[in-house]
């Protein structure tokens, strides 16, 4: 199960993990905050 981060403006979902962290320059804690701020919890 991968928890994705949904960016409404882009309409894309990215799995959390090292690749996402490198791409966005975010750490897991930041992604956690982003998920709650966006209000999206996607399961893939």
Swiss-Prot record:
Induction: By water stress.
Other facts: On the 2D-gel the determined pI of this protein (spot N76) is: 5.8, its MW is: 32 kDa.
Protein origin, superkingdom: Eukaryota
Record-level Gene Ontology MF annotations: beta-galactosidase activity
Protein name: Putative beta-galactosidase
Class in the EC hierarchy, top level: hydrolase
Assigned EC number: 3.2.1.23
Reactions catalysed: Hydrolysis of terminal non-reducing beta-D-galactose residues in beta-D-galactosides
Family classification: Belongs to the glycosyl hydrolase 35 family.
Keyword annotations: Glycosidase, Hydrolase, Stress response
Sequence intervals crossing the membrane: none
């Amino acid at each position: 199960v991968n928890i994705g981060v949904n960016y409404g403006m882009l309409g894309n979902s990215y799995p959390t993990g090292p690749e996402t962290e490198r791409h966005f320059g975010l750490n897991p804690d930041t992604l956690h905050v982003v998920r709650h701020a966006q209000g999206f919890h996607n399961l893939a």
